[in-house]
Structures are given as C-alpha cells and as structure tokens.
Design a protein with these regions (language model features):
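Outer-membrane beta-barrel "beta-signal"
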Residues: 11, 169-176, 194-205
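Short amphipathic alpha-helix initiation/capping segments at coil-to-helix junctions
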Residues: 110, 114, 158-162, 171, ...
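A short, conserved beta-to-alpha structural element at the edge of catalytic cores
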Residues: 162-183
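C-terminal outer-membrane beta-barrel translocator/porin domains of Gram-negative envelope proteins
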Residues: 1-135, 139-143, 147-149, 191, ...
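Outer-membrane beta-barrel transmembrane domain signature
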Residues: 143-165
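A short, acidic, flexible beta-alpha connecting loop/helix-capping segment that sits on the rim
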Residues: 183-189
Length: 205
C-alpha cells in the first residue's frame, strides 16, 4: 500500500449529551455518532463510529457506568482500504493490552481490522479517601473484538474476544485529569502484547 493517495472527506458528528457534568459524571448518558463520507478519494473508505455511555448508582455512595463502542471502515467501491484507515481498539476501551497490538496479523505486522466493538463497565469503590472529592477509585471490566481483513479473508480474527479487569484511579489534579490503571487480561491470544500499567494525562476513563 505504498504510494501517494488523494483523500477528501466530509465529516459529520452527532452528539447528544445528557450528562450532569463532563468530569466525575454521576448521572445521565451520552450518545455520539460520527461518519466520514468520501468526497474525492482513491479508495473511497466509508467510516462509521458510534459510542454510548450511561451513568447510574448501584448503591449508596457508588457511581457506575456502562459504555459501548462500535467502529467500522469499509470501501464503498470494494477496494482494499489503506493500513492507516484500518481500525484499532483504543487503549481506553481495552486496558491490559498494548495499543495496536491485538487483532489480525499479516506475518509479524498487526494490521487492525475493518470492524471493532468494545464494551466497558466501571464502578467506583467507596470508603477510600472519603474526604477527597477530586479522586475516584474504580473497578473495571473491558471486553473488545477486532476483525475483518478485506484483502485476505484468511487473516480474519473475528472469533477472538479480548477482555480484562482491573483497578483505576482518576485524579482531577490542578494540571488536569490524570488516570492510573492496573489491568489483568482475562481472555487473550498468544500473539497479543500485554500492558499491565498505564498512565494517561488529560483524560480519564
């Protein structure tokens, strides 16, 4: 897939946000849909992305969340999409694994997929640092699947669901949101690259 490509896309986003607040959300939901429509493109890749998050209370002094992500990239002219346009599962959606190091492989190369899905559940752990209002401890479970190789069906990885569980700390510090997570893979493949600890600056889970 070497060479020069010309791509012009029209991006449309639809965001319906009913969360009570952006950070440390305690109630509400957010539904987001994005589509990239090829206008002038060498391989005419159509991209669709959807995410949904719901926040609720399971018991007193607890906040839990459920989220879903769906992602798809496919050429509308039945051509093979470029490697740079193939899908990978974000590390925020599948903790415990290195970024871009799961899913279909071509030889030694991880090539991503045409389709991706992720489901996440997180729940705060009460009775820890009760006096601190800017720190959240959470238990989480992640599950994801990445599949579809348009140029070689034999490389498909649709039957391999990856999952993990772990603990996370969200700290809303003066310099911005910080996240620390420890994750343990539950289901995996031998070719996957694991990542037990992850630190993020500027984002929380």
């Amino acid at each position: 897939q070497e060479g020069n490509y010309w791509d012009t896309f029209l991006n449309l986003d639809f965001n319906y946000d009913k969360r009570n607040q952006k950070f440390q959300t305690t109630d509400g939901f957010r539904s987001f849909y994005s589509i990239d429509l090829p206008i002038i493109s060498d391989n005419e890749t159509l991209k669709n992305y959807y995410s949904y998050s719901q926040y609720f209370e399971l018991f007193d002094q607890n906040i839990s969340s459920f989220s879903l992500m769906l992602n798809a990239a496919k050429s509308i002219s039945n051509k093979d999409i470029k490697l740079s346009e193939r899908i990978n599962i974000p590390t925020s959606r599948l903790r415990g694994f290195e970024s871009g190091r799961i899913g279909p492989k071509d030889g030694d190369d991880y090539i991503g997929g045409n389709y991706g899905v992720a489901i996440n559940f997180a729940s705060t752990i009460p009775q820890i640092l009760e006096q601190s209002q800017n720190v959240d401890f959470l238990f989480f479970i992640d599950a994801a699947n990445l599949w579809g190789v348009d140029y070689n069906k034999n490389l498909d990885d649709s039957g391999s669901i990856r999952s993990s569980l772990g603990l996370a700390l969200d700290w809303y510090s003066p310099i911005g949101p910080l996240n620390f997570s420890l994750a343990y893979p539950i289901t995996k493949e031998d070719s996957d690259k694991e990542e037990t600890f992850r630190f993020n600056l500027g984002t929380t889970f």
